[in-house]
């Protein structure tokens, strides 16, 4: 699963996602993309599940790019622990996804196959998504 090798601070405040994506909102590498229609944090496990689903669907034919990276630590205290005694340990890593972020890209496959692979991947994600073609975003 994806996680950063090294971070400046181990723990971070939660924060929230507001507004639309200013960066990462255009298709840069592939022909087809999966764009988020909502803002949310996506875990490294969800990204991996979507990647596996896509690569199995396109088989050896195409190339898949993951455009998001989980670099936000999510902390959690153990179950049945009393309050206090400091912030909990890092449980998993999240990727912040704003509205309009291109999350995955595919190239080298027909449009129908790319669309079915992206829809399969979107079923693994907690946000509503849409399939886009490179010429749609220009």
From Swiss-Prot:
Cited function: Binds 23S rRNA and is also seen to make contacts with the A and possibly P site tRNAs.
PROSITE patterns for the chain: RIBOSOMAL_L16_1, RIBOSOMAL_L16_2
Keyword rRNA-binding annotated: yes
Family from the record: Belongs to the universal ribosomal protein uL16 family.
Span list, region Disordered: 1-21
The entry's keywords: Ribonucleoprotein, Ribosomal protein, RNA-binding, rRNA-binding, tRNA-binding
This protein's GO CC annotations: cytosolic large ribosomal subunit
Record-linked HAMAP family: Ribosomal_uL16 (MF_01342)
Protein name: Large ribosomal subunit protein uL16
Entries under InterPro entries matching the protein: Ribosomal_uL16, Ribosomal_uL16_bact-type, Ribosomal_uL16_CS, Ribosomal_uL16_dom, Ribosomal_uL16_sf
Record note on quaternary structure: Part of the 50S ribosomal subunit.
Gene: rplP
A single GO BP: translation
Biased composition (Basic residues): 1-15
GO molecular function, one term: rRNA binding
Signal peptide: none
Alphabetized Gene3D superfamilies for the sequence: Ribosomal protein L10e/L16 (3.90.1170.10)
